[in-house]
Amino acid sequence: MGIPENLTCLLRNLYAGQEATVRTGHGTTDWFQIGRGARQVCILSPCLYNLYAEYIMRNAGLDEAQAGIKIARRNINNLRYADDTTLMAESEEELKSLLMKVKEESEKVGLKLNIQKTRILASGLITSWEIDGETVETVTDFIYLGSKITADGDCSPESKRRLLLGRKVVTNLDSILKSRDITLPTSVRLVKAMVLPVVMYGCESWTIKKAEHRRIDGFELQCWRRLLRVPWTARRSTKSILKETSPGCSLEGLMLKLKLQYFGRHWKRP
């Protein structure tokens, strides 16, 4: 890779015989050796992984490969974030070719493809894959960087999942939000800072249908009713709830703002 020997020797000595301990509420554990995996609190680990990943992708020829998906006149065949890598192609043959190239180049630098953590997502029919005698699992959806990706591209499962996660956060904060020691404006700010971002995560790419609009509006109203301790059985208009809480921009409005910002950034790209 062209890295001087003195630097590789320094890194090797840094990781050789590395030990760690875990501190808990009951004290610290015994020291144990770290054989492989992520080196906790090591600022070098992400840099080293990115260096290897870039080296593998370049040697695999992914930059010059014709396989991939055309987006805004650009050919994209791989997405990488930290240690998550996604390969994309328009056909099964192209995808398998990309995967085998990456696998071969990875083995040259001592990295092995973990079939147990590898998934295939296809929008159509696909044959069963076997690599080194192991079958690669084919799925209809999976979680990538915190968002659920489905084979049919439907955003409804992800929006429902996000609303469910938002409700869990509200439940966890229930004692704080209902505390009489916290003013209503502070509680509203807590919801906007800790609950709504959970729901809005990844919403820039959502296609929101009428049913989702109703669910989103219902979730937001449920949050404000909870702050005011107003049950659903109470005859209280939505307008009066919003007037008392004064949340400002609605949840749907915040989502629209994120969508426009996302669109604007891509529109300005050359």
Predicted regions and their residues:
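Nucleotidyl polymerases of mobile genetic elements and RNA viruses
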Residues: M1-K257, Q261, R269-P270
